[in-house]
């Protein structure tokens, strides 16, 4: 019962966040300087892909933040060269309250956000929508309201992801 109420509260907060995202001015970007990647645990091992993506746009590794979303209670910590934060459903409070310990992270503004997941789930969408990003890129099977650019490809196809994002994002920048 508590999980159902928590899910309902998170769904309401997600709705508020989606409204906020849709009303944001997108403005003209000339260059991306910061990158946020929100991914499921199954895609968290793609550090090389994320670094290659950032390199295409001249984003320094120090300006990359990865958020890994998991259903597990206990997460294995993996040492990476990219700033990485792990979230579980327990990280989010009962009424969809985000962790106080990561308040600064949620206040930070990102130039580009990649929603590197291809499914629709309230927890994933809520965390993704909680960040302040100028431009959001995602995949076709997730909530389209989350993203400004939607790629109809499989996230497991790394080379295709690099090619497609390079094509479309460079067109947006020019």
Model-predicted segments: where are they?
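Structural beta-sheet core signal
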Residues: 37, 66-68, 138
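Short, charged/polar "capping" segments at the starts of alpha-helices
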Residues: 44-46, 72-77, 146
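Active-site and donor-binding regions of nucleotide-sugar-utilizing enzymes
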Residues: 91-155
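Structural motif
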Residues: 38-42, 69-70, 116-118
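Histidine-anchored nucleotide/phosphate-binding helix
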Residues: 38, 42-59
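Short N-terminal or domain-adjacent regulatory/targeting segments
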Residues: 2-34, 41-44
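Active-site-proximal region of nucleotide-activated glycan assembly enzymes
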Residues: 144-174
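Conserved nucleotide-cofactor-binding alpha/beta core module
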Residues: 58-102
């Amino acid at each position: 019962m508590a999980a159902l109420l928590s899910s309902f509260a998170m769904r309401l907060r997600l709705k508020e966040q989606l409204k906020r995202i849709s009303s944001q001015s997108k403005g003209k970007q000339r260059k991306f300087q910061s990158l946020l990647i929100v991914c499921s645990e199954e895609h968290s091992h793609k550090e090389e892909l994320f670094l290659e993506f950032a390199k295409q746009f001249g984003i320094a590794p120090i300006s990359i933040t990865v958020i890994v979303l998991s259903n597990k209670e206990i997460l294995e910590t993996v040492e990476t060269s990219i700033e990485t934060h792990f979230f579980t459903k327990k990280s989010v409070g009962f009424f969809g309250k985000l962790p106080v310990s990561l308040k600064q992270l949620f206040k930070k503004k990102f130039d580009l956000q990649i929603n590197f997941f291809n499914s629709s789930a309230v927890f994933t969408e809520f965390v993704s929508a909680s960040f302040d990003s100028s431009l959001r890129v995602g995949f076709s099977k997730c909530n389209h309201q989350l993203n400004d650019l939607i790629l109809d490809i499989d996230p497991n196809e790394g080379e295709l992801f690099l090619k497609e994002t390079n094509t479309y994002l460079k067109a947006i920048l020019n």
